[in-house]
Amino acid sequence: MTRINTAPPAVLTDEHLFAEWRELPRVLRLALDARPVPARYTLGAGHMRFFLPRLGWLGRRHAELTAELLSRGCALTPRPPLPTDGGDWEPDDDARRVNAGRLVERLRGARRPMHHRGVVVPATFYDHLLA
């Protein structure tokens, strides 16, 4: 599974932030595949493919994730920056709602405690994103 969230990196748990930073570059591997791109933000099948015409947004998102991880004191393996030219995107309310629901679901179903800046967060930590 590859996570690409719409929530600002600053509100993600440490675990979700690092997972997205690590997994987001996987989308670039799909660029040579000719299957159709979904018209709307989706989770599951088509999630990564949705971002192919939006690679500029992905590059900027990855830079934001990197900056947030560094601000939290994470030691990262250096990676070349992703390109920031190309298609842009602004998540609409529907995309934010879908993503918030998934974040809430993952946090509530977590087997181990999750953290924000090293502090354990309650299962309701992401509930404000649903409003």
Positions of predicted regions on the chain:
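Extended, charge-rich alpha-helical interface modules
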Residues: 1-131
